[in-house]
Swiss-Prot record:
It is found in: Cytoplasm. It is an enzyme of class 1 (oxidoreductase). The keyword Nucleotidyltransferase does not apply. Pfam families: GSHPx. It comes from Nicotiana sylvestris. This is Probable phospholipid hydroperoxide glutathione peroxidase. Transmembrane segments: none annotated. GO terms for biological process: response to oxidative stress.
Length: 169
């Protein structure tokens, strides 16, 4: 684990909170390809993104894909519910089997350290801020951020990149 003074080298240097408030060391995902996404329950993009995320997860979870979903209420107040309400909605309505973590800020002074790292790894065209719900980061098996996708990019359209990282033909 990286000490506080050293700069994080990969997402494995971070610990986040799960939906129950327990610490989760992201190094448990070593060897997995990850989609890290900020989610919201009341966004116009909710249905299409959650449906696609669930489908792509079912298709590739056995090959090593994991999706890490982080609820965020910073965009139009579209994630106002408690973490229990969010989990219930996602698991019941969208049959999500991937982890939903504790609610986070993705921008500003209180942004989660993981999100500060993600943004610094893949800023570029997007700048340093997350623009809206369902911004997606693709992470390789070594914990490196390899790509960033806009909220309107569907998880299904990421499939070619996901397959490449998984080594699936």
């Amino acid at each position: 684990m990286a000490s506080q003074s050293s700069k994080p080298q990969s997402i494995y240097d971070f610990t986040v909170k799960d939906a129950k408030g327990n610490d989760v060391d992201l190094s448990i995902y070593k060897g997995k390809v990850l989609i890290i996404v900020n989610v919201a329950s009341q966004c116009g993009l909710t249905n299409s993104n959650y449906t696609d995320l669930t489908e792509i997860y079912k298709k590739y979870k056995d090959q090593g894909l994991e999706i890490l979903a982080f609820p965020c209420n910073q965009f139009g107040g579209q994630e106002p519910g408690s973490i229990e309400e969010i989990q219930n909605m996602v698991c019941t309505r969208f049959k999500a089997e991937y982890p939903i973590f504790d609610k986070v800020d993705v921008n500003g002074d209180n942004a989660a350290p993981l999100y500060k790292f993600l943004k610094s790894s893949k800023g570029g065209f997007f700048g340093d801020s997350i623009k809206w719900n369902f911004s997606k980061f693709l992470v390789d098996k070594e914990g490196n951020v390899v790509d960033r996708y806009s909220p309107t990019t569907t998880p299904a359209s990421m499939e070619k990149d996901i397959k490449k990282l998984l080594g699936v033909a």
